[in-house]
Amino acid sequence: MEIFNVEELINMKPFKNMNKITINQKDNCILANRCFVKIDTPRYIPSTSISSSNIIRIRNHDFTLSELLYSPFHFQQPQFQYLLPGFVLTCIDKVSKQQKKCKYCISNRGDDDSLSINLFIPTINKSIYIIIGLRMKNFWKPKFEIE
């Protein structure tokens, strides 16, 4: 992808409500509710990362990246801000047209009910990536309202 700075990321409107984001110019990062999008050289891409087109197995269930992004578990949570799945899929599509691969991994943060996803999307500069972190609290916890 041809992205060089945080302003170009902002123009792509990665979040539902762009008025409620925090911009960290020093770190080339856009922060929102439990998620971030930044342009940087990753310290490392975990060896457990898989291609964005592959299925990942979590708790004996198979998921595609799209299923995780559009998950009803996530959107049922009351929050004022979330990462737009269409933004992620558009980035992946643009990169795949350039014959490059995006990777993602699930990171274990010690909370059994949460899900943390890290995505690594290459840019034209080989060492620079768009790094997306998505943290979903209570992902595995069923919630019921009794009337």
UniProtKB/Swiss-Prot annotation:
It comes from the Viruses. It holds the Pfam family Pox_F15. InterPro entries: Poxvirus_F15. Induction: Expressed in the early phase of the viral replicative cycle. Keywords: Early protein. Belongs to the orthopoxvirus OPG058 family. This is Protein OPG060. It comes from Vaccinia virus (strain Western Reserve).
